[in-house]
Amino acid sequence: MHIMENNRFKVIIVEDVKLELKGTEEIFRHEIPNAEVIGTAMTENEFWELLKVQLPDMVLLDLGLGGSTTIGVEICSSLRKNYPDMKVLIFTGEVLNEKLWVDALNAGADGIILKTGELLTATDVQAVMDGKRLVFNYPIL
């Protein structure tokens, strides 16, 4: 599927495991050419600092940062308040924690993708950019 090149958008990736951060960045670089990764953060503080420099169109957010599973939800709700147009896509390894997913969606996340076996695809990312809500690769309207 060819996505129009002029439909470019900027992404910040927030992920505290370096290997996963690199892997996710690679996926964007190779699979989603119209996305420009303008920054990556491994801590919440790094992320807020990045936002002062440049605002992305989408944040790819790991729910658990630095050992806290709830911090992603907090980041999400404060993004919703301060930047209502910014898309927030949650990328999480918290497979069995359904309460967390519900909290994330209630906090205004535009989508949740599980890290287990589900690769981030251009289609998913584009769906969220187009305003669909995505839970585990199934758009919900």
Give, region by region, the residue ranges found by the protein language model.
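Alpha4 helix (beta4-alpha4-beta5 surface) of REC/receiver domains from two-component response regulators
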Residues: 74, 95-112, 123
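Non-catalytic signal-transmission and effector/linker regions of two-component phosphorelay proteins
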Residues: 1-12, 19, 129-130, 136-141
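Acidic, metal-coordinating helix/loop segments flanking the phosphotransfer/catalytic sites
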Residues: 25, 40-58, 65-68
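Two-component/phosphorelay signaling modules centered on CheY-like receiver
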Residues: 17-44
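Short amphipathic alpha-helix used as the core "switch/output" element in two-component signaling
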Residues: 70-85
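Two-component signal transduction core modules
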Residues: 59, 88, 112-113
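Hydrophobic/aromatic residues positioned on beta-strands within the core alpha/beta folds
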Residues: 91-92, 115
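C-terminal output helix
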Residues: 99-100, 116-127, 138-139
